[in-house]
Design a protein with these regions (language model features):
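Switch I (G2) and immediately adjacent beta-strands of P-loop GTPase domains
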Residues: 1-28, 34
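Conserved P-loop small GTPase signature centered on TRAFAC-class small GTPases
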Residues: 4-11, 63-160
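Conserved beta-strand segments of the P-loop GTPase G domain that flank and frequently precede/overlap
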Residues: 16-17, 40-44, 77-80, 108-109
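The beta1-alpha1 cofactor-binding region of Rossmann-like NAD(H)/NADP(H)-dependent oxidoreductases
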Residues: 19-22, 47-48, 114
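Conserved Walker B
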Residues: 20, 45-46, 61, 82
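Inter-motif core of Ras-like GTPase G domains
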Residues: 25-48, 54, 64
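Generic recognition of short, well-ordered alpha-helical segments
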Residues: 27-31, 52-56, 88-92, 119-120
């Protein structure tokens, strides 16, 4: 799925790849992840096992993409299927995970009903936009000024 989000005069293209945690997509990861500026991790709120896999998926993503600073790479977490009554993943566990990972933003979503998807997509677009803006700024070299003074030649003489 591709979604275009407008940020001022800039357009941000979100490309969403639903691999459903399938191992068969692991070998294709590098082509999926190349040039990405942020990552949405999605788990099933009705499956504690799915939530446990979030850390595995996050680590695989970071290993494959190999960004310069893994600790600050922007992730966002979606807990999907919030429309279902049998939610089994505890909010406390989700909050703890997000706090452990740089206060990762979290959205309880429903792909079926469209709950919180727009808000989540806008948040990840903001994160990618801010990351891209900061990385462009980092290419501007710092300007340093050096004061050059010329020493007065010493006078030679008998009293000098």
């Amino acid at each position: 799925m591709t979604k275009l989000i407008q940020k001022g005069e800039d357009s941000i293209q979100l490309q969403l790849w639903d691999t459903a945690g399938a191992e068969r997509y692991n070998s294709m990861g590098s082509s999926f992840y190349r040039n990405s500026e942020a990552c949405i991790l999605v788990f099933d709120l009705t499956s504690p096992e799915s939530f446990k896999n979030v850390e595995i998926w996050r680590n695989e993503f970071l290993t494959t993409l190999n960004p310069p600073d893994k600790s600050t790479y922007p992730f966002i977490l979606f807990g999907n299927k919030s429309d279902l009554p049998d939610i089994k993943v505890k909010n406390e566990d989700i909050q703890a995970y997000c706090q452990e990972h740089n206060n990762m933003p979290y959205f309880s979503t429903s792909a079926k009903d469209g709950i919180n998807l727009e808000e989540g997509f806008n948040k990840v677009a903001d994160m990618a936009y801010n990351r891209n803006t900061k990385s462009e700024e980092s290419f501007i070299p710092d300007t340093k000024f050096l004061k050059i003074t010329q020493e007065e030649p010493k006078k030679k003489g008998c009293c000098g």
